[in-house]
UniProtKB/Swiss-Prot annotation:
Protein name, UniProt field: Core protein VP8
Function statement: Major core structural protein.
Induction field: Expressed in the late phase of the viral replicative cycle.
Protein family membership: Belongs to the orthopoxvirus OPG098 family.
Keyword field: Host cytoplasm, Late protein, Virion
Propeptide segments, given as residue ranges: 1-32
Site description Cleavage, residues in chain: G18, S19, G32, A33
């Protein structure tokens, strides 16, 4: 198993949002396969945000964006190669908003994680999969734009035979196996970290406003794993208390 996901999921990957059902879909996976983006909980579902599209982009909104990213402190420490150095709020922001990141996928208000369908593992289907393992320190990061940004959708009736770059300084609503996410392109130029929350052992959220609070939180990892059902409840709580961007889409 990849060390990248060591503290995120169980030993077996049980869901593939990037699985290919038709040959034509292969090009869509390739279109984003080499993109540079910060890993998060969405990586559990093999979501690879695309940097190219074969469809025309239609402008649907121009507004400020607020979106969420779930990950673990281990994931960030490992990717930054911090070793024994302490993880700070500044390091978390620099990880997600590194200028080398071409795209950042955000969970928004109309991201419906109930669309997750667990993959069969042997003869068993784990209907309540582990999202964050016991002993991990998951965090919720809230990002917002510094100013209004253009939000696009793909016109599925305008398919081309060639893929073209989506471009910088814009957002694109995208769907991966039924899960809507908002991809923000060149996030370092338009986004900022607004808040960080930790998870209590009662499956509630607590705001981490200082590096000291972040350090104390990391010393008290989860005593029990957070499974899908509990995570869905947490996500709904987040949506009710944090005004995430809502972009209604038609299936």
């Amino acid at each position: 198993m990849s060390l990248l996901l060591e503290n995120l999921i169980e030993e077996d990957t049980i869901f593939f949002a990037g699985s290919i059902s038709e040959y034509d879909d292969l090009q869509m996976v390739i279109a984003g396969a080499k993109s540079k983006f910060p890993r998060s909980m969405l990586s559990i579902f093999n979501i690879v945000p695309r940097t190219m599209s074969k469809y025309e982009l239609e402008l649907i909104h121009n507004e400020n964006i607020t979106g969420a990213m779930f990950t673990t402190m281990y994931n960030i420490r490992n990717n930054l190669g911090l070793g024994d150095d302490k993880l700070t709020i500044e390091a978390i922001e620099n990880y997600f908003l590194d200028p080398n990141n071409e795209v950042m996928p955000l969970i928004i208000n109309n991201t419906d994680m109930t669309a997750v369908i667990p993959k069969k593992s042997g003869r068993r289907k784990n209907k309540n999969m582990v999202i964050f393992r016991q002993g991990s320190s998951p965090i919720l990061c809230i990002f917002e734009t510094r100013k209004k940004i253009n939000i696009y959708k793909e016109n599925m009736e305008s398919a081309s035979t060639e893929y073209t770059p989506i471009g910088d300084n814009k957002a694109l609503i995208s769907k991966y196996a039924g899960i809507n996410v908002l991809n923000v392109y060149s996030p370092s130029t338009s986004m900022r970290l607004n808040a960080i929350y930790g998870f209590t052992n009662k499956n509630k959220l607590e705001k981490l406003s200082t590096n000291k609070e972040l350090e104390l939180y990391s010393s008290s990892p989860l005593q029990e794993p957070i499974r899908l059902n509990d995570f869905l409840g947490l996500l709904e709580c987040v949506k009710k208390n944090i005004p995430l961007t809502d972009i209604p889409t038609k299936d």
